[in-house]
Amino acid sequence: MSSQKTIESTTPNLPTPYYLIDEQAIVNNLTIIKRICDLSGAKALLALKCFATWGVFDAMKPYLHGTTSSSLNEVRLGAEKFGGETHAYSVAYAEHEIYDVVSHADKFVFNCFSQLNVFRHVADDKGIAIGLRVNPITS
């Protein structure tokens, strides 16, 4: 019989479903990413669209420069729970959301020239850096 512990044997009363996250595996991967950043001068951001489990943000913060977000709620989560740089990007923003998004962001990346033309003044008024996503084939 194996002496290896199973999840069931170590956490028999945990309600299900639940997420089991191996923080050490995350830290191991982030250590590699941080080393690449240190050697290259690049910055690494956590994309909240793919991983927004704020319960492990404290373990991740030392290795990343901040977050990138594609909605108002993600921008707020990054600013309030992760810290560091907060980048905002979305293919579309509702006009009533744009002021809230910009109030939580350090950088705003516009999806197209028309979005830039309509909302640039909001980012400029806030004094945050801006960017423009360019897709030469379809933009």
Each language-model region and where it sits:
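Short, flexible segments with low predicted structural confidence
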Residues: K5, S9, L30-I32, C50
